[in-house]
Amino acid sequence: MGAIERNGYIFEPEYSVISQDGAIHVYKEGKFVEEIKFEFQGKFPEHNQIEELVNHYCAQFHQ
């Protein structure tokens, strides 16, 4: 799963299958902004879950 670019931000997801959690690191202009934590089930998070988190971030905090 690669980085997602949206609204001037870069979202880089990473996750741990063992602990069943992950985080999306948010960057703007190359600088770290914040971390969005999430949980998932299965072997990896579904792409739709990541997209929903990114969409929510963009809609709620940085229009």
Where is each model-derived feature located?
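N-terminal acidic leader/helix
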Residues: 1-31, 35-39
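Mixed-charge, Lys/Arg-enriched low-complexity segments
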Residues: 31-63
